[in-house]
């Protein structure tokens, strides 16, 4: 008889979990990263890159296409012109121990951008998006710290580009 009770309890948990998923899905709740139905609606976007970062330009292009927009090199075809004015990453000490040894660092990534219609009308004045992470000083010295910074910088760049796409999607 106890085995039957465990099976029944397990079945009730599965049923409860399924009902919760159905209710949350029905009210529009989505996991982080879902587009939620908002898109760039096929807008043709030209990117003017003043940062010189190939990785950033690639990430922005992929995000535009992944958000329902289209990327173009030709300014004459574009609906919007997205200008990437600059990007910067910086590191600072976040915490130290009693002896003054660094325990944690804070890495920050900032992207300056603006958006205009192809005719020149400004849609978004120049502004900045920022993302940051705190990370423990890794064992292994400067090489390990640089490797960890590079890994986090890529994550922060992706986060800032995601925020940029969310901002652009609100303008359609």
Spans of model-derived segments:
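Sec/Tat-exported extracytoplasmic proteins
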Residues: 64-68, 115-119, 163-172
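C-terminal/domain-edge helix-coil "capping" segments
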Residues: 143-172
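N-terminal segment of the mature soluble domain
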Residues: 40-88
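N-terminal secretory signal peptides and thylakoid transit peptides that target proteins
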Residues: 1-19
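Surface-exposed short loop/turn segments
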Residues: 83-128, 134-147
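Short coil/turn motifs at beta-sheet boundaries
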Residues: 38-40, 75-77, 100-106
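Bacterial Sec signal peptide processing site at the extreme N-terminus
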Residues: 21-42
């Amino acid at each position: 008889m106890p085995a039957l009770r465990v099976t029944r309890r397990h079945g009730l948990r599965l049923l409860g979990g399924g009902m919760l998923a159905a209710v949350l899905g029905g009210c529009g709740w989505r996991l982080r990263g879902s587009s939620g139905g908002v898109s760039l609606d096929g807008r043709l976007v030209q990117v003017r890159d003043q940062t010189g970062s190939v990785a950033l330009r690639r990430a922005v292009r992929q995000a535009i296409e992944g958000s329902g927009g289209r990327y173009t090199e030709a300014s004459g075809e574009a609906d919007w012109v997205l200008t990437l004015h600059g990007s910067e990453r910086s590191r600072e000490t976040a915490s130290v121990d009693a002896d003054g040894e660094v325990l944690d660092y804070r890495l920050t990534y900032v992207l300056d951008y603006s958006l205009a219609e192809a005719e020149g009308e400004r849609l978004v004045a120049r502004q900045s998006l920022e993302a940051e992470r705190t990370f423990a000083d890794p064992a292994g010295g400067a090489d390990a710290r640089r490797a960890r910074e590079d890994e986090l910088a890529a994550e922060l760049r992706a986060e800032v580009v995601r925020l940029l796409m969310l901002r652009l999607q609100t303008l359609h």
